[in-house]
Curated annotation (Swiss-Prot):
Top-level taxonomy: Eukaryota, Viridiplantae, Streptophyta, Embryophyta, Tracheophyta
Identification of the protein by name: Homeobox-leucine zipper protein ROC8
Gene that produces this protein: ROC8
Transmembrane intervals: none
Gene3D superfamilies, per the entry: 3.30.530.20, Homeodomain-like
Signal peptide, first to last residue: none
Gene Ontology MF terms: DNA binding; DNA-binding transcription factor activity, RNA polymerase II-specific; lipid binding
Length: 710
């Protein structure tokens, strides 16, 4: 038995020795030796073993472990140092980028040569190379065809190169491939920028906070910053407020902000008015891009949420999002404004909200050859205060820098340069009209004079008409992804066309050809609006009605102005009994809109019964009517006579004086096969359709000698 106990005790003793901790004296001497010699030889380890009472093997392992520990400590320290240096360099890089934006050349006092200059040089070289290649291919084609090969003129916009002269005289020519007239909606799909990095988030949050503070100061500032200019606003005042740029620069001074290139135009405006919606509901509209586009189809042609930076707890308060937006004035004659910006929503106190916008430069876009932004939104937004009876008081501030790289179309030059095209009064007027329409949509009852329409049918009809208006407005954009071709011809009417493959369930499937032209008329906006929306005068301009009268079957009002309504029209001709026309007319202090689309009777019955109208295909056409913005006219940059006071009188947008800029737009289904070709005859047909419509409108309004086209 003793024989078995002894090995057990010796094993336990070895285990205790294996995990034996060194004494403080042993550790002190080992550390001292390690400082002198981290790699002791065998003799040194033997001497330490005798002095400390440890085995040589223990000495060897201790030094190995100590060297490994020191190496790990050094690596951690180096990593921390390199990480700090990396963060420091990145911050310095960002600061240098910001400084370069505002640096001033000491010689000429202007900005230095930027990356866009070198990008322009590269593009010129690439264009020269492509021109040589085109000339070479043209020569080869001429030899093959045995006749000269005609090219389009150099001024033809990009992505619209074609060997076919799209003129009225081009009837019976060869078919035109679909890709040669490329619309934006079915071309290259829109690519959102990448989400915000962790490095960018705090910077954007700081920018949004500063923008919010500046917005509140601007919204509450007095006459020292805001000056009154003639024209009136949506609230019925005698003048509208524009920003005094010099005073603004002195108060909100920014590095290099005193210098602006001659091509940069500053637009600043402020407007206040009552809106039929609560402050909380308005904040939700502003922070939801889908609702944002639905409320402002006449201004916002496209909007996307790139990233949600801060998701407010318990509502929209303290929410921060990064947005992309395209702004337009519903004509292909003026390019859209494309803006990346952060939107900050904050509840300041009970019943008072603030929405602040400010542009951000997404530097990562520059690596993919994206052009520098032409539009830059400075701190803008609105203050929203709850009032009685479901109303809110909105103070809107719009502040933007725009670089005009190409001449503005002569018809819209006064309207754009005055700041009225995208000013605060236009935003607020559109918001007031949209809120009235929404209140009519959610109202439970139906006016007693609307016979045969149920509340469900009314809502269904309003939703269908809203989709029609949104589709029409978005089809008029002129962005990089949605470009138009100007038709050549001897006629004075300059028609722009584009086409796309339609696969949207809300549109007919196939090839859709869109055409539009803009004209100036020496007639007040409200007169033009009343003429084109009235079913009694429709036969005077509607070519497709062949001079036959139309009758209004039903009308649904959607605002306090009688001009804001939805109508179902029916032709009195026996051949038109199977089709109806859905029409919505909209007007506010900034302009007017008349949109219509054919709809068959079975589809109309589906809508009137209250069923879902989302699958009913529509191909809308219509008119946009804007004041010409000429100085001194009552229909200038903003118009007071068509505000809420004029609404009771039934006046349209633009007031009772001055001229109008009218855009006429048609969409036609060329073929129900998406892969089909477009024949020049189809282009000539729509060209003739627009030309005839324009001439008939001018004749009916007694201004045949005054029409002017871009």
């Amino acid at each position: 038995m003793d024989f078995g106990d002894e090995p057990e005790g010796s094993d336990s003793q070895r285990r205790r020795k294996r995990y034996h901790r060194h004494t403080p004296r042993q550790i002190q001497q080992l550390e001292a030796m390690f400082k002198e010699c981290p790699h002791p030889d065998e003799n040194q380890r033997a001497q330490l073993s005798r002095e400390l009472g440890l085995e040589p093997r223990q000495i060897k392992f201790w030094f190995q472990n100590r060297r490994t520990q020191m190496k790990a400590q050094h690596e951690r320290a180096d990593n921390c140092f390199l990480r700090a240096e990396n963060d420091k360099i990145r911050c310095e890089n960002i600061a240098i980028r910001e400084a370069l934006k505002n640096v001033i050349c000491p010689t000429c006092g202007g900005p230095p040569v930027g990356e866009d200059y070198f990008d322009e040089q590269k593009l010129r070289m690439e264009n020269a190379r492509l021109k040589e290649e085109l000339d070479r291919v043209s020569n080869l084609t001429s030899k093959y065809l045995g006749r000269p090969f005609t090219q389009l003129p150099p001024a033809t916009p990009p992505m619209t190169v074609s060997s076919l002269d799209l003129s009225v005289g081009g009837m019976g020519g060869p078919s035109l491939d679909l890709d040669l007239l490329s619309g934006g909606s079915s071309g290259i799909p829109f690519q959102l920028p990448a989400p915000v990095s962790d490095m960018e988030r705090p910077m954007m949050a700081e920018m949004a906070t500063r923008a919010m503070d500046e917005l509140i100061r601007l919204a509450q500032a007095g006459d020292h910053i805001w000056s009154k200019s003639p024209g009136g606003g949506v609230s019925g005042g005698d003048a509208r407020e524009t920003l005094n740029v010099d005073t603004y620069d002195s108060i909100f001074s920014k590095p290099g902000g005193s210098y602006r290139a001659p091509s940069i135009n500053v637009e600043g405006s402020r407007e206040s008015g009552l809106v039929l919606m609560s402050a909380v509901a308005l904040a939700d509209v502003f922070m939801d891009t889908n609702k944002w586009m639905e409320f402002f189809p006449s201004i916002v042609s496209k909007a996307h949420t790139i990233d949600v930076l801060v998701n407010g707890m318990g509502g929209r308060s303290e929410s921060l999002i990064l947005m992309y937006e395209e702004l337009h004035i519903m004509t292909p004659a003026v390019p859209t404004r494309e803006v990346n910006f952060v939107r900050y929503c904050r509840q300041i106190e009970q019943g008072l909200w603030a929405i602040a916008d400010v542009s951000v430069d997404l530097q990562r876009d520059a690596h993919f050859g994206a052009p520098p932004p032409r539009s830059r939104r400075l701190p803008s937004g609105c203050l929203i205060a709850d009032m009685a009876n479901g109303y809110s008081k909105v103070t809107w501030v719009e502040h933007m820098e725009v670089e005009e790289k190409s001449p503005i179309n002569v018809l819209y030059r006064d309207l754009v340069l005055s700041g009225a095209a995208f000013g605060a009064h236009r935003w607020l007027a559109a918001l007031q009209r949209a809120c009235e329409r929404y209140a009519s949509l959610v109202a439970l009852g139906v006016p007693h004079h609307i016979a045969g329409v149920t509340p469900e049918g009314k809502r269904s009809m309003m939703k269908l008409s809203q989709r029609m208006v949104n589709s029409f407005c978005s089809s008029l954009g002129a962005s990089q992804m949605h470009q138009w071709t100007t038709l050549s011809g001897s006629n004075e009417v300059s028609v722009r066309v584009t086409m796309h493959r339609s696969t949207d369930p809300g549109q007919p499937n196939g090839v859709v050809l869109s055409a539009a032209t803009s004209i100036w008329l020496p007639v007040p906006c409200d007169h033009v609006f009343a003429f084109v929306r009235d079913e009694n005068t429709r036969s005077q301009w509607d070519v497709l009605s062949h001079g036959n009268q139309v009758q209004e079957v039903s009308r649904i009002p959607n605002g306090s102005n009688p001009g804001n309504c939805i109508s179902l029209l029916r032709g009195l001709n026996a051949s038109q009994n199977s089709m109806l026309i859905l029409q919505e007319s909209c007007t506010d202090a900034s302009g007017s809109l008349v949109v219509y689309s054919p709809i068959d009777i079975p589809a109309a019955n589906v809508v009137m019964s209250g069923e879902d109208p989302s699958s009913i295909p529509l191909l809308p056409s219509g008119f946009t009517i804007l004041p010409d913005g000429r100085p001194g006219s009552a229909a200038g940059a903003s118009t007071s006579s068509a505000g809420p006071l004029a609404a009771a009188r039934g006046g349209g947008g633009g007031g009772a004086g001055g001229g109008s800029v009218v855009t006429v737009a048609f969409q036609i289904l060329v073929s129900s096969l998406p892969s089909s070709k477009l024949n020049a005859e189809s282009v000539a047909t729509v060209n003739g359709l627009i030309t005839t419509t324009v001439e008939q409108i001018k004749a009916a309004l007694n201004c045949s000698a005054h029409g002017h086209h871009p």
